[in-house]
């Protein structure tokens, strides 16, 4: 049986970590989709990245799967996917899931706080 830390370690090996400055530079690119996987309460308290999809970690499989009624049409396998959470752990796990679902260009951009500190655009 694997521990949570083992799963996280495997996810971190599978999903490249993109530094926040590089992520901010990609913001607004038509080829890039940013997903905030924190829950609604966390986003309500801190805001999120401007234009980010708000898809909670527990719903990502449905939003990413084009065969479900819950598919988010912005989720396309030819897009570059940047995933953010509070500190990077949920983003890594989400990235692993997306890669296993066939999304090739998936990056963990860490936590929203780092994005905000780097001057990345935000919204309520």
Spans of model-derived segments:
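Rhodanese-like catalytic fold shared by cysteine-dependent sulfurtransferases
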Residues: 1-32, 40-80, 89-124
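Active-site flanking residues adjacent to catalytic metal/cofactor-binding acidic residues
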Residues: 35
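Short, surface-exposed ligand- or partner-binding patches at beta-edge/loop junctions that are enriched
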Residues: 84
